[in-house]
């Protein structure tokens, strides 16, 4: 009898949790927004005679869009993927991870940490919702950041929490 009551209580509890989760919407990038970020970043790079690998992940750290520009090395493209995934996982810029590694013993060994600038979080236009991440690689880190931010701006989104 006790086991039956416990099983029923567990099932009811699980059903109410699932119902609450179904009602909660998680903000994330759409495929069209990811493409707009890639297009904006590529346009910025071409205007400034730069070559990048560009990666965009959603808020759950799933790859949405990727481009290895003509002439970009395989290594640069792979590094863009790693930077963007790190930002999607940790929800802050890789430049911040660089600072955290220097100031927080052991943080550099945490899963997914990339301590080189170039990965940038993507927020909704009003800065309220974390939507995902974009990263570029192939140029000096600050130029990678500029390109990523240009892509975010071109998509009508924000690189900063507001």
Please place each PLM-identified region on the residue numbering.
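Bacterial N-terminal signal peptides that target proteins for export
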Residues: 1-6
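Flexible, solvent-exposed loop/hinge segments and secondary-structure transition points
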Residues: 21-162
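C-terminal segment of classical bacterial N-terminal signal peptides
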Residues: 12-20
């Amino acid at each position: 009898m006790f086991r039956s009551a416990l099983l029923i209580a567990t099932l009811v509890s699980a059903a109410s949790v699932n119902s609450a989760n179904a009602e909660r919407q998680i903000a994330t990038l759409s495929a069209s927004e990811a493409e707009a970020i890639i297009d904006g970043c590529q346009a910025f790079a071409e205007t400034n005679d730069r070559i990048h690998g560009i990666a965009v992940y959603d808020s759950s750290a799933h790859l949405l869009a990727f481009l290895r520009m003509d002439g970009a090395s395989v290594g640069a493209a792979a590094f863009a993927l790693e930077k963007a995934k790190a930002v999607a996982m940790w929800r802050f810029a890789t430049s911040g991870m660089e600072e955290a590694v220097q100031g927080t013993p052991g943080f550099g060994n945490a899963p997914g940490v990339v301590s080189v600038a170039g990965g940038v979080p993507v927020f909704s236009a009003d800065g309220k919702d974390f939507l995902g991440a974009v990263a570029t690689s192939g140029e000096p880190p600050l130029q990678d950041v500029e390109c990523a931010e240009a892509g975010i701006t071109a998509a009508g989104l924000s690189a900063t929490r507001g």
